[in-house]
Every structure is written in C-alpha cells, then in structure tokens.
Amino acid sequence: MRRKMMMRGALACALAACGAAGAQVLAPWTPVKATADAVETWGRAYAFASNALPTRIVSQGRDLLAAPIRVVCAGADGADHVWTKAGSWVQAATDEAADVCGHLAVPDVFVNATTRIEYDGMAKVALAVTPGKGSSRMRNLSKVWLEIPLRPEAATLFCYSPCSWAKLENVGAVKGPMAWPFRCSVWLGNEDVGLCWFCESDERLAAADPNRVVEVIPGAAETVLRVHLADGALTRPTTWTFGLQATPTKPFDRRLMTGQTVHAPPMGAGIPGLGVKRPEVWWTCQRALPQGNAGKVLAEAARGGVKTVVFHEDWIPIQNNPSPRPDFKGLVDACHRLGLKVLVYLGYELSPLDPMWGACEADCLAHDARGNPVSYWDREPAQRDYRVCYNNRFADIWLARAKKAYVELGLDGFYLDGTVMPRACANAAHGCGWTDAAGRRHVTYPIFAVREMMRALYAFVDARGGRIDAHQSGYVCPATLAFAHSYWDGEQLAVSGGARDIKAELDLASFRAEFMGRNHGLACEFLAYQKPGWQYEDALAISLLHGVMTRPCGFANVPPFTPIWKAYADFGTADAAWRPYWAKEAVACDAAHVKVSAYEKPDGALWVVSNVSPTDAATARLALPLGCRAARDAKTGEALPVAGGSLTLALEPFRYRLVRLWKE
C-alpha cells in the first residue's frame, strides 16, 4: 500500500535523476554541481564528509548546521552507539539531481542512507537500519532518533503543518523546548534562511509518546530538531523516507513585492460573521461583476493601479474544472486590452457535476481515516464539492485541463486554492493511508505526488511567462511551494468563529516565520477579510512593515490601495535596498511599539512606520538619515516637519504611515 502511494513521486524523481527524456532544470534554478561527497544547488550546498547524512548545509553562504546530522541509536543497555565505521560518496549526478550514498556501522547495527538532491535543493532521504555483521536478525538496538542540530541563530523561528485554524499556534519564535505529535512538515529558520524536514507518513514512526514525535530543543550551542523514529527495540529492518530542504528555494522575485493584484470577488462570501451573503444564482464571474458592467469596472481598476486580476471559482460553472462558458474569453480579452493580466481559480475539489465524477469518485477523492469523502463547500449552480487527492490519475487529468484552458483563453497564470497543499488522505484505492496493528486507518500526506504535479504545471506556466499564485494558509513546505511564483496567506486568521483578536494573536515573529516570503524563496501577499476589529488598514500595518502587500478583495476595495501602489512605484521599491526593523542598523525610534522598515536609495528612502500595539497610541521620534532635507507622507503628499535630525509622528493603535525622505 505504501509502495503504491510513493510510486508517482518516486518514479518521476528517478527519471529526473537518470536524465530521462523530458527532465530539465527549470528557471531560475541552476544545474546541480557534485564533487566527491558534496552537492551544490542554487544558493545552497549539502556536504556529507564521510557521514550517512549531511555534515554541513549552507544556504546563501550561511551555515545552518551546528554539527553533522545524527542518527542516534542506543543498544540494549540504553547507551548510545558510537559509530566505528562511516562513509559517503556521490553515486551519480546529472544537471537535474545527484544521488549520495552513505553508511554508519557498529558490529550489531548498520545504517544505510541514500539521498537524492534535486536542483531546487530538495533532498529525499531513504534511511535504513538493518542488522549488522554476522546476523540477519535485529539485536542490540533499543531506540533510533534522527537529530538535526542547527545553529541557534539559524533557528529562531518555526512553522509546521498540518495545523488548526482555530488559533495561530503553528508559527512563531523558538523561545523554549517544543514537542508535537507527527507533523508532515517542520521548518526552522530565521528571517533569511531555514531548513525544512518533511515526511508523508507516520506509519513507521514508533514514538513512546504520540504527543512527542517531533521535538525542538534549543540550547546555547545548538537547537536540535529531533524526530523519534523508534523509542523501542526494532524487531526487523526498517526504512524511513523523509525530505530535507534548505530555504530560500530560489531567488526572491522583487517584481512581485508591490502587489497591484486584486482578487476580483469580495472574498469571504458565506463565511459566518463576515456579513457577506453568498449568491443564490450563478453566472460568469457573478461575485466579481454582479452588475455585469465589466468594461467600466475593469477600466476603473486599471486607472487605480491594478496590474493583475484574479477571478475566483465562479469563472467556471463546475468547481475545479477549467471549462468556462464562452463569454469568459471576452472578459479575458477585455482585461488584456487594458493591460491587465488574468489569473483564474483552480483548487482541490471534484464536483458531482464534473463529467469525470462517475469515473473518478471512488479512487480519486480524498478520504478521512474513517473512509469518508471530505467536503465543506457547496456553491452555485447547486453542487457539493469534495476534496480530491492528487496522488492518483486525476493529477494528469487536472494538468491536461489546466494547460488546455491556459492556451485557449490566453491566460497569464493560475490562482491555486490549496492545490499546493498535500492534504491528508486515507483512500486505499490509490495507495494513501495505512492500517495499524489494531486495524485502525491513518491518513498520509502525498507530498511527493503533489510536488511532481506542481513541477509539471510550473514548467508549463513559467515557460510562457505566467505566474502561479498559491493560496496555502498555514502551509509553507518548500517541497511543493518551490514550484509557485507567489503565495497568498492569512485566511486562517479570518474565518474562525468567536471573538478572535487577530491583532493580539498575530505577533511579529509569527509574521516573519510564515507570511514574509523572503526566507522561503517567493513573494507573499497577505490575505485579509474585512470584519469588525480587522480591516485592511490593520492588515497593512503589519504586512507593509515586512515588505508584504495586503491584497484587496473586490474591485470596490481598490481605491484605498491606489496611493500605496503609487508610492511604491514612484520610489521604485523593487530595485531599492531593504532595511527591515529587525536589522542591526534599523532606523532608530524611541517608541517601543513603533517599528520602521526602510526602502533605501542613494537620494532618499521610503519608510514604513507602524505602531504594532493593538491597544496603545504612540508618539515616536525617528532618527533621520544624514543629509535628509525633506519628508512627506507618501500617500497624501503632506509635508512632515523635520527638526533637529529627527521626525516625530503620532500613530493610533495598529496604524502606519508611509514616509518619503529626500537627501541633499
């Protein structure tokens, strides 16, 4: 069963590593470079130095590891084995991937590891523990742990998946020891770099405490990510398959920093507490253009600075089936005449209205651990949509449909709602899930299958100059997210019920860990649904501070963003140096809750000044750069008084100012 689940992703990876027809190094990555026991990819390097697993991982010139990655095995007496033999070598290498083989040994136990490192830096590891010399039976082994010792300065932030949307607990600062049940993806890093461990299944993980499968243990010399592979004696040879990937995965595309994207419908329709009624009828782009006055609305959007329009699910009558009504092509053409690019919605569901439903519902839908299909969405025309799993033949059907629509409609990209997320699935018909000794089913996460589907879509779209925009709230695993150009994150903060205080919950460290993009390798836009206590101005106060634009939902919400986009474009933030508030050389400010991030050029700067306190107003005095001669509010043009080498601003709670500075 497990072997069948891995087949799609494993076969594609093997073909790529062998240089099979169709394999290629996609832009902006560079070919793999391999030496005797080290592998380099764009911006990163993995060295093995006679060890089964990496002894050194470097990202952007920075060492991530404090010591070699460890396989910790204990003997029957509880004492850790001290490996007496070790070695590694590069077995094979092409431009697309390299295979590294490594081993550790004591007389009673052998550890063998094969690591395939692909051009985007994804390292897929098969780690096997077998009987040692002279015996075919496991003996003298009472535990197996994987320990990844990271430099403390390279592991100040964390994020993991899957997560609950009820409370923002899966991201933040590493402040002390943490322990969790199985997580399919765990990233540790800082504002610039990081390392992700990911795994599709907990089938072979035998932790004594199911709530401590994964641990993070900070220390003065190293911060350890520990995975409990086995907390008891192994009775037979065992192999664990997992992945490692250093981030960022690719060069940060500064062109996408300024946003100027509008999500065409007023998002949040039908979500309790947001006060937006879901439509009860269907026509093409009903929520985006309820009056049908497309020409006027699109022209106003273009004048307001919009560069890209994203049409949500109602561009098509059948969910996740990119076969629109004939009138949609005219809408795409109208956008193009105004210089607007068009992205369209695709997602993660299969509808009973889809002509492929009868042929696919049994073996292509995602099932929960009880064997039930999963659905929490319905829409017009009347249909209940079910979560699909892409670890099966439907991935090929979906890809073919997407490519056909892209070409026929002249699209500029896709907005992928959850597609990049390997969703939990236990459908045995296509190999997902596993059954324990008591007969209970468990879900698995098809990371490698989704990765190969995303790689194929990225190759197609990127070759045509298009954009893949991934919506993935709560999920930042680079194995799949690398094959997107941007991501839209934040829905988990907006949809949960109750009196949720988002401004208090979303601390700065959490934003830097998940929502910033730079440390993961692609631009992020922040998602905010307006509701009492959480408006666009609130979202902008924290997002702009981190170099992230909040995306407006609905054409009616474009006007407040127009002066922001104009200020960024006029200054040229895409080619300016960026000095964030956490940098050692950050702009000096005398108010504790006021932070300043700066875009800088030789002749001046654009400051984002934010009061991040949810409750307290602040008056802040800011130290001006040497030679500053004038300051203005970049949104309104208002002149701001400069005196004594400083600027004083008053800010209400969770509000910001954009300040343009000029030098002599």
Q: Each PLM stretch: what is its role?
A:
Residues T239, A643-E664:
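C-terminal beta-strand-rich structural cap/linker in extracellular carbohydrate-active enzymes
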Residues I316-L346, H442:
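Aromatic-lined substrate-binding rim segments of carbohydrate-active enzymes
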Residues R393-C477:
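Active-site and adjacent substrate-binding regions of carbohydrate-active enzymes
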Residues V310, W315-P324, P355-R393, P422-R451:
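Aromatic- and acidic-residue-enriched carbohydrate-binding clefts of CAZyme catalytic domains
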Residues R137-R151, V612-G627:
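Surface-exposed beta-strand/loop patches in extracellular or lumenal glycoproteins
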Residues P446, R451-L626, R632-K635:
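Active-site-proximal substrate-binding groove within the catalytic cores of carbohydrate-active enzymes
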Residues E40, Y46-Q60, L65-A76, W83-A86, ...:
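Carbohydrate-recognition beta-sandwich/jelly-roll modules
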Residues P290, F328, V332-D333, V342-L409, ...:
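Active-site-adjacent "subsite" loops/lids of carbohydrate-active enzymes
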